[in-house]
Amino acid sequence: DKGVNILKLPLWLLSVDDYANILDVTDYSQIMIIEKMLAYVSLFAKNDEESNRYKNHLIASAIVSVMYSNQVSARIRDQIFSILTDCHTPELNLDVEVPGVGYTRTFRKCFEIDSQGQFVERILITEYIKKFVDNETKWNEDYVPTFFTIDDLEVALNFTLISEGLLLSEKSYAEATALKVKL
């Protein structure tokens, strides 16, 4: 239409309140998610070694929390696959080759379930993942306005959802998913 003007907003200049208004946030927990998302997007937009290490740390920590939750193996596997579908790096994804003793298999194959209902490669999974958990580094999560795209914002939101353990709480997950759909 000739009478329609499109307003293009620079995403990196918007505040938490701006995003809360644009996304029609109705719950305080969603504001906290937006705050964390903006902190992550400014860190991840650098696309450097530190941001990749932090992504690996967040993914590994989320996987560890799911693995040691009180759920059946099939549910744990589904949640881990969900994490790795939404959040992945070259080092942590479903198709990465994980070296074992005398063999190599994809990370996806490590989650096959045996006749006792356990992961066949539970030890291999644990050893591989714990290499990426880094609780010693003090990560800079301060929001610094820097150029990013809506796709970068979506990635940051996905990492926010896994880092806050929202997969483990149905109520929180529902609120977070509503925010994800609006974005």
Each model region followed by its residue ranges:
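P-loop NTPase motor domains
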Residues: 1-183
